[in-house]
């Protein structure tokens, strides 16, 4: 036997049609009705006394939150100009890109996509890079070479 969540005395006989909260009688339903509300934006119902507000995630040390919502990379997470130059000038990386026409085409598309994006975090570009890493072995090899060089000099 499950007792009513409002009066804690009688057995449950009914459930709220809006949120399925169990109650036993009309007086308990009236008490519950004052605490039950429908949220109109997505037609969901909540019970005021039960749900806790969602807390935002803890910020990562490498992410700066602007207005509490828009992340951008912290300066220390970005590669230095000298590191970028050494990666671009690396003979093995240059050779891999120049010897693979498809890879050269992908790199040009990614550069163009990055130039078109606005904001501090190029989400479309990052998504495109991830897709290429998943579906293109040559691109994965290039990404691995760049990351090895990046972490070797960090």
From Swiss-Prot:
Zn(2+) 1 binds at residues 4, 7, 24, 28. The keyword Cell membrane does not apply. It comes from the Eukaryota. Keywords: Metal-binding, Zinc, Zinc-finger. It holds the Pfam family zf-HIT. Zn(2+) 2 binds at residues 16, 19, 32, 36. GO terms for cellular component: cytosol; nucleus; pre-snoRNP complex. The keyword Glycosyltransferase does not apply. A zinc finger (HIT-type) spans 4-36. One of its GO terms (molecular function) is zinc ion binding. Gene3D superfamilies: 3.30.60.190. One of its GO terms (biological process) is snoRNA localization. This is Uncharacterized zinc-finger protein C4F10.19c.
